[in-house]
Amino acid sequence: MSRAQLTSTVEQNTGGAVAPVIAGKNALANGAFEIWQRGTSFNTASAYTADRWQQYSNSAQSVSRQATSDSTNLPNIQYCARVQRNNGSSSTAALAFDQNLETVNSIPFAGKTITYSFYARAGANYSATSNVLNAQIVGGTGTDQNLITGYTGQVNIISSTLTLTTTWQRFSFTATVGTNYTQLAARTYYIPTGTASASDYYEITGVQLEAGSVATPFSRAAGTLQGELAACCRYFYFDSSNAGGGLCRQASTTQSYANYRIPTVMRVAPTITISNPTGAYIFSGGGGTSITGISGNGSSQAYYGLSLTHGSVGAAGYAADLSFGTATIQLNSEL
């Protein structure tokens, strides 16, 4: 055994030194819950929350970003996701939290041994019977499907229960993936009981899915924070007012068009959602006016277009300056 292998083994078993950064080892993007482009708190039955992670239940639940606040049992990971039943809720529907891998990232695991690991702890009023949390790796034989709507040939490759305490613990599970599986998903869920109190939740972080029979120290999927953001932007990109606007081309005094390059090539041509379009402005020919409407005008994996209507300004053929102001653009290529 080399010194590097020995050091890694000791660190893994003792929880000691910081793990080496190994880009590509972890198949799950944003496993440390550092990227939250959509916001940091959600209260709904089904939605994407932290980048790449979605919640699902038959009733509204809360998912939020929290500080891990424990440098002893959980060193070197700043954030976690809190999955919570709403205070006062009497719904006992399962609360699920999962990430779908696209087919191109699932096929490399076919026929291999995998290990699924994460850190988790319970809230003070966690209501699952015997403090149980369920952990699953789900497989399917389809292409780029979503676990909420179901996988073709769906099967649980890993399906285990674990017991939470209010202290962070690391859990790991190992199994072999069938040679015919073309999609994987990681899921945790709990089944609440009774009526929820204020701290009926569990928290999770350091989520990792890797090839091999041993849970190695946690690493970001892309190695660095910048790389992790780029990995997340393959599926969702949030263009905010802080990004400015740039130039657009006027078709008339009241109609303009803009085209933008997306910083990361997306999984597929994204759908475009615009919020608060009237918060944007256009400046042309020495004057300026408010935008009255913005709509998507085509997209590809690398570019997207906008069609803008506005008050009279400039002239056809002018290059105008566009400021998003408080308007935001969301590009979605999720599964």
Where are each of the predicted segments found?
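Extracellular and organelle-lumenal recognition/adhesion modules and their flexible linkers in secreted
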Residues: 2-335
